A protein has these predicted regions:
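Condensing-enzyme catalytic core mediating Claisen C-C bond formation in acyl metabolism
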Residues: 1-53, 155-226, 230, 234, ...
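Buried hydrophobic positions in well-ordered alpha/beta secondary-structure cores of metabolic enzymes
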Residues: 11-13, 39, 68, 79-82, ...
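Short beta-strand segments
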Residues: 12-15, 85, 115, 141-147, ...
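Acidic-glycine-rich active-site phosphate/pyrophosphate-binding loop
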Residues: 32-41, 91-105, 143-149, 204-209, ...
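Glycine/charged-rich beta-loop-alpha catalytic/anionic-binding loops adjacent to active sites
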Residues: 45-47, 78-83, 102-115, 150-156, ...
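Claisen-condensing/thiolase-fold acyl-transfer catalytic domains that form or cleave C-C bonds
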Residues: 58, 62-65, 69, 88-89, ...
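Phosphate/pyrophosphate-binding loops at sites that engage ATP/ADP/AMP, CoA/4′-phosphopantetheine
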Residues: 64-80, 234-251, 299-304
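Flexible, glycine-rich active-site loops centered on histidine and acidic residues
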Residues: 133-168
Length: 335
């Protein structure tokens, strides 16, 4: 991969954090009144983590960020910016990023949230890269994805309740040697499809909305799956062609874990072998904006992603928003 931009930027450290509580799909099946086999075969999630009393998205994000900084060998006070992707903040004001800045001790960083739902972390990566390119004095940006969707799920909705889990993932982004790091990032939004996934804490502000469950996430699952099946092949083809590669040249495919069964299907149809696909959704569910960084951190800690490897990231989120990025794992990245 030789066509990366002159000012190359890459991931030099990863971290993640999951809640303590494990929720087996047998428990979910009993809550929904469906067979356990139905969840396993239709969704592919065996268990997920739900935040318990006292656990917050902010706390998960702060621990993931601290781990990423530690692995990168970067002191908190050297961080120039924190970009945090979430669509489930505990409060709209202040943003989660500001709380994380305080928690990790990144006193010199400016911090703010972005919301592109499950696709938000990739938007954060594009934003972070822009910051580093715009000012040579900036050295390090923390990009965090954190969500607690369990708190906006309807336990009676079989379209959403089996899918999601809570968690946070983080990376440290910095300049890396030429020919390494992140290549072109492509992100698209079609607001006409905004009704495909709707919900969230904002509706809690009205008593009637709370009583009627308006804060619960609702999804048109079949429509979302159809969009993924349509757009996924083009995302893959465009990414590899731009760098003069083929699917076989991609060492690792890290996808948003919307539905593990769907991830396996579209990856196989695009020509990927099972060994190329990083799968986490089967054991932690769909962790929304945390999905991609958790996938990266998992593969790094497992020793799968190594310096020089080619990694393709693909994401989808409400909006609808979808995107991709191809990168060569930097030599400066630490396991």
């Amino acid at each position: 991969m030789t066509r990366l931009t002159p000012t190359d930027v890459g991931v030099i450290g990863t971290g993640s954090c999951l809640p303590e509580r494990r929720v087996d799909s047998r428990e979910v099946a009993a809550t929904l009144g469906v067979e356990h086999r139905w969840i396993v075969e239709r969704v592919g999630v065996l268990e997920r983590r739900f935040a318990g009393t006292g656990e917050t998205g902010t706390g998960l994000a702060a621990r993931a960020a601290a781990r990423a900084l530690d692995r990168a060998g970067v002191a908190p006070e050297d961080v120039d910016a924190i970009v945090l992707a979430t669509s489930t903040p505990e409060t709209p004001i202040p943003g989660v990023a500001a709380r994380v800045q305080e928690a990790v001790g990144a006193r010199n960083a400016f911090a703010f949230d972005v919301n592109a739902a499950c696709a938000g972390w990739l938007v954060g990566i594009e934003t972070a890269r822009g910051f580093l390119r715009a000012d040579e004095r900036r050295r390090y940006v923390l990009v965090v994805g954190a969500d607690t969707y369990s708190r906006i799920l309807n336990p009676g909705d079989r379209r959403t309740y089996p899918l999601f889990g809570d968690g946070a993932g983080a990376v440290v982004v910095a300049r890396v040697p030429a020919g390494e790091g992140i290549g072109r990032i492509e992100i698209r939004t079609d607001g006409r499809l905004g009704h495909y996934a709707v919900g969230g804490h904002g509706n809690l502000l009205t008593p009637d909305g709370l009583a009627g469950g308006a804060h619960h996430l609702t999804m048109l699952g079949r429509d979302i799956a159809a969009l993924v099946r349509t757009e996924f092949p083009a995302l893959v083809e465009d990414a590899v062609k731009e760098e003069g590669l083929t699917v076989a040249d991609v060492d690792h495919l890290v996808c948003h874990q919307a539905n593990p069964r769907l991830v396996r299907e579209v990856a196989e149809n695009a020509g990927f072998r099972p060994g190329q696909v990083v799968l986490t959704g089967d054991v932690i569910g769909n962790t929304a904006a945390a999905s991609l960084p958790i996938g990266l951190d998992t593969a790094v800690r497992d020793g799968r992603i190594r310096a020089g490897d080619t990694v393709l990231m693909i994401t989808f989120g409400a909006g609808m928003t979808w995107g991709r990025a191809l990168m060569r794992w930097p030599s400066a990245a630490r396991p």
